[in-house]
Amino acid sequence: MAENSVLTSTTGRTSLADSSIFDSKVTEISKENLLIGSTSYVEEEMPQIETRVILVQEAGKQEELIKALKTIKIMEVPVIKIKESCPGKSDEKLIKSVINMDIKVGFVKMESVEEFEGLDSPEFENVFVVTDFQDSVFNDLYKADCRVIGPPVVLNCSQKGEPLPFSCRPLYCTSMMNLVLCFTGFRKKEELVRLVTLVHHMGGVIRKDFNSKVTHLVANCTQGEKFRVAVSLGTPIMKPEWIYKAWERRNEQDFYAAVDDFRNEFKVPPFQDCILSFLGFSDEEKTNMEEMTEMQGGKYLPLGDERCTHLVVEENIVKDLPFEPSKKLYVVKQEWFWGSIQMDARAGETMYLYEKANTPELKKSVSMLSLNTPNSNRKRRRLKETLAQLSRETDVSPFPPRKRPSAEHSLSIGSLLDISNTPESSINYGDTPKSCTKSSKSSTPVPSKQSARWQVAKELYQTESNYVNILATIIQLFQVPLEEEGQRGGPILAPEEIKTIFGSIPDIFDVHTKIKDDLEDLIVNWDESKSIGDIFLKYSKDLVKTYPPFVNFFEMSKETIIKCEKQKPRFHAFLKINQAKPECGRQSLVELLIRPVQRLPSVALLLNDLKKHTADENPDKSTLEKAIGSLKEVMTHINEDKRKTEAQKQIFDVVYEVDGCPANLLSSHRSLVQRVETISLGEHPCDRGEQVTLFLFNDCLEIARKRHKVIGTFRSPHGQTRPPASLKHIHLMPLSQIKKVLDIRETEDCHNAFALLVRPPTEQANVLLSFQMTSDELPKENWLKMLCRHVANTICKADAENLIYTADPESFEVNTKDMDSTLSRASRAIKKTSKKVTRAFSFSKTPKRALRRALMTSHGSVEGRSPSSNDKHVMSRLSSTSSLAGIPSPSLVSLPSFFERRSHTLSRSTTHLI
């Protein structure tokens, strides 16, 4: 191919390019400097050549490979067009390009290089497919400068419908295609050459110098300029094992080395090659940081060990080092430690070096505060100026004093309405109001005589301003950075986790910013007749909208923070970094997020205090009462919504526990009343002896049986695993379908039994469902009363007691004898197996005559009574029980096919449940 024929024309010359022309020294990367050209000029000027694919040795025996080659009709061919710049001048311009050409010869099989002729013939463009890039055949082809590809390239092109690619180097697979790598820290040339070769075989590109085009840095150490630049640019820094493991998976289709799940296993951890020690931390914090050090690839040693590379210092506590550090030891602040974990790379130490807190001016000022009383006016004046300077330099934090952890845990959201009228119980905020959104319009004017009403109004404004600052801190320091795109090391939290944590905080911030601005206008232009109550009435609807969603889900927000902090080290580091900032007042995110929970009761206290100091003739007196009422209404909504939220959570638990539970069980008006564990005593709603769970809701009854075989765990897209569903849905029954509740008398053969007489709307007969309660926690009498009360509420009847009837077990052929015996369990298992075979032809026996006799005979053992009445015979029993029969049909209790199936399609009558 070195002496390819050239066709000359007046416009230029075109040559089939020798692969050597596209050597790495010329093009650096295979396709970056190539233009995908059209074949228009080639058809006119290119000599006719023949493209062909040659399967070498084992490649010719792979049926999958041969089948894939038959679907590929095109390959890329490199060409060089030689174009003269001007006629008569010797200057020539080389235009390199890659064109697509048809594969005229499908494929040729070859056993050895020697037997194949025409390797260098200009009449052919040959592509050799080799299965092993380590054997002698590959080496011979490589030395002959032939185009060599691996089977994965062919399979990939066939799958995607792409032409066979051109590469100036042997290309086994495309698992590193479009990746640009740079290496640092390698001292053994042989290892570096091996890694570079593998990258080229997988389609990757190598850069000697680090620049913005480099996608990955492969590092053998954590020092050097390339490492620091990669950290600053957020470029992933990888171990050499990443390349080796990717090469091991070279034959896998659809594998790509840059996929996060694979790549993250081989990222250089932040503390690789680092040995840390810690100073100034509590035992608990130190233990936590030592565990994080090992987790992030580092080691730790006791303080003062000469082998340590870094000393991490708690700069807020440590004022002086206990020893003189060596020149090789980095003494850094704790922010370096947490920052490295957050960015998932070792941060530069120079930005976080620990320095002693030297404040000579302050020391000089404080030194003047001696025990000796100044004897001159000059000393007194200097002392006064020093104290004034200290007071000006002291930044009063807008945050209240930090509470004990026990105080936080003792807070109950449900106690929001428990508002004391003592102003001493309100939080003592700082005296200097600050605003994160804008500065105050003017300094607060002080009336000549400060009234108590003005003092309380000023405190209300100050606390509101501080509260807005706290909300702004939450948003600016926590929420906004977490939501930013292009975070170094990838997103710290998933979007749904961020939404769960912060909820409606931005909406709360917007409302209170407006309230603060209105209060500021009122304070600046103070007048006793100005109405403060109008401000809160103005935004009462906004408060109702924004607060309940956040306060009701605060516990969920708190749990999400704790869970993510344990599972995600970068999030833990992010919280630690921000907690150390002065804006947070050394408080955690959970402690800051609890402020909205506390704010409304605090405002109500101040408004109550303001009302006390407002004259009766002042119009704001009545307005304040309305404002306090509106705040209580908001807190009432919070408590009601909290109860609704808990009720909805219970329904969700039922849905997850019951496999196949209908979706229409979820409804805003529905709540779970009681759960009862029972055993089925009849053939319906499931086989006798089956464990059945009844979920009583305020308007329906969910019937579920215990699963015979537990299904696999449910895994959400976010990796959280739910317990497997332990129950199987049978039927969701509206309470309106329950016509009577039968209290079965206690006998030797029947204990704790009851029955339900139901009328499905799609059937012409009543159905008897009998159960035995298995738990003694809830007495049967209480359960039946509860059930009848909700049935009566559903059908809009006041006489719930009339729904209960007492009956003898013999009348309905109900007994609980031997329910748990081995023989009974074996019998049920045999019966269940036989039903699977003959279900289509089986006709279950029914207690037809027994139930007819119990319901239709004028004298029997059934006595209609209320739960509170004494048992006695009722002579007019036929008339009293006629409602049980419904339709006087001989097939009154024929068991319908409605309960023959183990799961049912919802009937039309259940649509009202939605």
UniProtKB/Swiss-Prot annotation:
In what tissue types does this protein appear? Expressed in lung epithelial cells (at protein level). Expressed in squamous cell carcinoma, primary non-small cell lung cancer tumors and lung adenocarcinoma.
| Alphabetic keyword roster | Acetylation, Cell cycle, Cell division, Cell junction, Cytoplasm, Cytoskeleton, Differentiation, Guanine-nucleotide releasing factor, Isopeptide bond, Neurogenesis, Nucleus, Oncogene, Phosphoprotein, Protein transport, Repeat, Tight junction, Transport, Ubl conjugation
- The gene coding this protein: ECT2
What binding partners and quaternary form does the record give? Homodimer. Homooligomer. Found in the centralspindlin complex. Interacts with NR1I3. Interacts (Thr-359 phosphorylated form) with PARD6A; the interaction is observed in cancer cells. Interacts (Thr-359 phosphorylated form) with PRKCI; the interaction is observed in cancer cells. Interacts with PKP4; the interaction is observed at the midbody.
Q: Where is this region: Disordered?
A: 388-449, 857-884
Covalent cross-link Glycyl lysine isopeptide (Lys-Gly) (interchain with G-Cter in SUMO2) as placed by the record, residue numbers: 611
- Motif Nuclear localization signal: residue span? 378-382, 401-405
Modified positions (N-acetylalanine) in chain numbering: 2
Q: Which PANTHER family match?
A: PROTEIN ECT2
Which residues form each disulfide bond in the chain? none
Biased composition range(s): Low complexity = 432-449
What's the protein name?
Protein ECT2
Q: What induces it?
A: Up-regulated by calcium in cells forming cell-cell contact sites. Up-regulated by DNA damaging agents like H(2)O(2) or ionizing radiation (IR).
Q: What is the lineage of its organism?
A: Eukaryota, Metazoa, Chordata, Craniata, Vertebrata
| Phosphothreonine: residues carrying this PTM | 359, 373, 444, 846
